[in-house]
């Protein structure tokens, strides 16, 4: 799996993506479920789902008030194979201008690149489902069970232009409201600390993700471009360049898998945690406003019952969110620390291995050039 999120597996409900099929404009995921829960008709079953259905499930969690106190697992990114397909298409068009050996080698490399993106896409969608299945509350959601068990198309479509525009305006309003909520000092020191930390953490991960992408692009393009130019001039070391190029490609792939994907995932999940704190902050503001309204109603002896009811509803909502939010944020910390530690250690080990391989190649090449071998 591209992103290790340190999930606690539960034998009563296990979900994975057992197969996936890439078509021209979509990917079909076979979602496989094993469960001993009484809610399901069978103990083991599979359904075929598309990306839009994953987004529908994610949005149904976000829009459900009952889950306001939980970190909603981030939605998987949309599959994007356009760049790889375009390269394969251009390769086909230029087949006549290169040797059979060159064409075969280029085709194999592009197919490997396409396969890597495909596997990463499948892994990201599987992580989302595993996170939901591991969550003690979200795993009981009716929509989630429908997603897993209903063996027909869910008739879910992507959002049209009007709906996307509405989402845009909602986000603008939410951003403005977020500034107001962020300015309110929390009554609980734990949440005040988490709010400050998450804002800084999210920005740092965002910056690291952008730098990681630039570093990987550098491995994939500039270094390889330099080698292609030098290749024609230094025939004696052409074999070294070819082997080094392959090692650099593996370095880029490892960095993409172990670092870039990890940063992108936790960029999305830290945003989900920030959204949780926003919902709690909004509930706190509503509760404080309800208290003020109740004081005014009592002072004027007007609409007191209505004000008391509103105050009680706001109080219950705030307390309910606070109760679950604290444990969610503690679990989030445990998860992310374990994931970063595991992936960074594995990446360091892989890069040491590749560096040793490069060193051996250079030493071997120097020996050849000096006439030692």
Task: Show the residue positions of the predicted features.
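C-terminal, extended alpha-helical scaffolding domains
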Residues: 160-373
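Phox homology (PX) phosphoinositide-binding domain
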Residues: 1-200, 204-207
